[in-house]
């Protein structure tokens, strides 16, 4: 599979891709790890020729995009961190209450609350760079006495979200390779145009476009 996968710049006009298999590969991509399991991403599977043409133009009409039969756009959604953190917290809390020994439930619940209700909001919140500077100062002070997370500027946390999204995209491309389908990841694109085409909210960011 790894030997087979290549970034393909031109796609066949006669051999049609199976959209259902692409959907299956996208389902498999959901198994990719993401930081704190927050899943701060969305995926848009584009199959309509008109929209594909618009996306291809926004990708500077690269041949891999203009000849693609389908396009998948990977989006980051850092703005949804509170909603996603709550979902992960609720799921894990239920697991603790069902399966943990009774004497350990309070301790494990407290750790879960500290992480998803305090630390995650502290790390992922944004306010014109101000909160990042505050986090950096806290990190430096804590770092004198114990190991601590240093990359806490708002730009650092944005990078974390994009890295997690990239893991999902890579898992998708490997799954496609397993189906003997070729893909091509594109980073050359007009992100604002793609956001407008897909009618994305302000907090969304285009992370990667994959032609297939």
Annotate the PLM regions:
Residues 1-212:
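Acidic, surface-exposed loops and disordered segments
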């Amino acid at each position: 599979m790894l030997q087979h996968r290549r970034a393909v710049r031109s796609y066949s006009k006669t051999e049609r891709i199976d959209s259902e298999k692409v959907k299956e590969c996208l389902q498999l991509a959901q198994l990719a790890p993401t930081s704190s399991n927050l899943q701060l991403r969305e995926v848009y599977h584009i199959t309509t020729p008109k929209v594909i043409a618009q996306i291809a133009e926004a990708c500077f009409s690269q041949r891999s995009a203009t000849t693609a039969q389908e396009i998948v756009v990977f989006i980051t959604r850092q703005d949804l961190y509170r909603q996603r953190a709550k979902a992960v917290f609720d799921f894990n809390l239920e697991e603790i209450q069902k399966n943990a020994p009774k004497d350990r439930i309070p301790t494990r619940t407290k750790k879960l609350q500290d992480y998803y209700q305090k630390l995650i909001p502290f790390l992922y919140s944004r306010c014109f760079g101000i909160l990042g500077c505050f986090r950096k100062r806290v990190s430096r002070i804590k770092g004198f006495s114990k190991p601590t997370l240093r990359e806490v500027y708002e730009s650092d946390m944005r990078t974390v979200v994009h890295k997690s999204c990239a893991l999902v995209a890579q898992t998708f491309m490997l799954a496609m390779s397993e189906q003997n389908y070729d893909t091509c990841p594109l980073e050359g694109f007009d992100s604002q145009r793609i956001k407008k085409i897909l009618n994305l909210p302000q907090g969304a960011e285009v992370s990667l476009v994959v032609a297939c």
